[in-house]
């Protein structure tokens, strides 16, 4: 399996509960390296652009409001099969359906406040990484 990069966001519900270290430990335990990380407060424009794929969905406004409600931690993760590996350790979007030991089973509050985001494909990972990081911020 190839070394690849994926994008991660630790959402406001996770940062509000100081879970960055606990989530990072799960990421690293799974064999992924955190090659870039920063804590930011997303602007409304950033959140609307990031979640533009959901613009027509009824939850779009609520999602954007949630993502700008507090700090987030944006990350670039690297490793063999990083995209699928991170999606596996995140767990199902609905924490009640997430497997034991996954980030969402351990830390998510609800479907809406599900602690983390991870890219779903190579192409989306590249776009999402570029939205928040310049090349010199990624130290692989």
Swiss-Prot record:
One of its GO terms (molecular function) is nucleoside diphosphate kinase activity. It is an enzyme of class 2 (transferase). One of its GO terms (biological process) is GTP biosynthetic process. Coiled coil: none annotated. Keywords: ATP-binding, Cytoplasm, Kinase, Magnesium, Metal-binding, Nucleotide metabolism, Nucleotide-binding, Phosphoprotein, Transferase. GO terms for cellular component: cytoplasm. Gene3D superfamilies: Nucleoside diphosphate kinase-like domain (3.30.70.141). The active site is at residue 117. Its EC number is 2.7.4.6. Its cofactor is Mg(2+). It is found in: Cytoplasm. Pfam families: NDK. ATP binds at residues 11, 59, 87, 93, 104, 114. It catalyses: a 2'-deoxyribonucleoside 5'-diphosphate + ATP = a 2'-deoxyribonucleoside 5'-triphosphate + ADP; a ribonucleoside 5'-diphosphate + ATP = a ribonucleoside 5'-triphosphate + ADP. Major role in the synthesis of nucleoside triphosphates other than ATP. The ATP gamma phosphate is transferred to the NDP beta phosphate via a ping-pong mechanism, using a phosphorylated active-site intermediate. Belongs to the NDK family. This is Nucleoside diphosphate kinase. It comes from Nitrobacter winogradskyi (strain ATCC 25391 / DSM 10237 / CIP 104748 / NCIMB 11846 / Nb-255). The gene is ndk.
